[in-house]
Design a protein with these regions (language model features):
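Short, flexible, basic/aromatic active-site loop/helix in glycosyltransferases
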Residues: 101, 108-157, 161-164, 215-219
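Hydrophobic helical membrane-anchoring modules
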Residues: 138, 145, 169-238
Length: 238
């Protein structure tokens, strides 16, 4: 479980407790919080929780490097084959994690399944944020053909080895489905709950994501055009 956070002091304790409750008894797990240069009490509150939650590991960036780099730091440090991520603001529901794990174990899934992407079918956000996200997802899906209705959802389950093979750049977490498919992996979307933010303030706005998102979109499209996946024919004599 990798959780990137920045200045989420009021969300740390309730979310850690929810994650531990959701995963207790289901599987062996660790919770890795990556503090991306917080300037509030986030780090202190995480450290205070380690005595109660021995599975909690805390990594800190001295200065903020962005959400994608925080996720990469956590995935690199992880000790398990499969990684779950969720946002540290409390809007993703940890109770959905067992459902993702169940889908991973479903024998009907494709053999090359590498990513299960959460899909916030009913978002608890402002109208402007929902509208901008719907437009962005539509444009991205049309350009990248990633067949994923919601790439911005922080709740994902993916293979650690696959993630570490992907091109790494700022905001790459929003393009994981396209990048995984570029490497030949299958992606499956799973409906998940989305909750209203109860504490703290969002680090993202419509305007500070727009132009960066456009540049990144064309960059990922360029990467896709540079890859041709072979169709392997089995030698009938062997």
């Amino acid at each position: 479980m990798v959780v990137p956070v920045k200045n989420e002091q009021d969300n740390v304790e309730p979310l850690v407790r929810e994650i531990a409750t959701a995963l207790s008894g289901n599987t062996t797990f660790e919770i890795i919080y990556v503090d991306d240069g917080s300037t509030d009490a986030t780090q202190a509150r995480l450290q205070a929780l380690k005595a109660e939650f021995p599975m909690l590991r805390v990594i800190r960036h001295r200065t903020s490097c962005g959400q994608s780099r925080a996720v990469t730091t956590g995935v690199t440090a992880a000790r398990h084959e499969w990684i779950t991520t969720l946002d540290g603001d409390g809007q993703n529901d940890p109770a959905d994690i067992p459902a993702l794990l169940a889908e991973l174990a479903n024998p009907a899934q494709p053999d090359n399944l590498e990513l299960l992407a959460g899909w916030r079918a009913r978002r608890n956000d402002t109208f402007l944020r929902r509208l901008s996200s719907k437009i962005a997802n539509g444009v991205r899906s049309r350009m990248l053909k990633d067949n994923t209705p919601d790439t911005g959802c922080g709740l994902k389950l993916f293979a650690r080895e696959t993630f570490l093979q992907l091109p790494n750049f700022d905001h790459m977490h929003r393009f994981l489905p396209a990048l995984v498919m570029r490497n030949g992996g299958a992606v499956v979307s799973v409906p998940v709950h989305h909750r209203a933010r109860e504490r703290g303030t969002s680090k993202y706005g419509v305007h500070n994501r727009l132009w960066v998102g456009i540049v990144d979109l064309f960059g990922v499209a360029w990467l896709q055009r540079r890859v041709r996946l072979p169709v392997i024919e089995v030698d009938s004599d062997r």
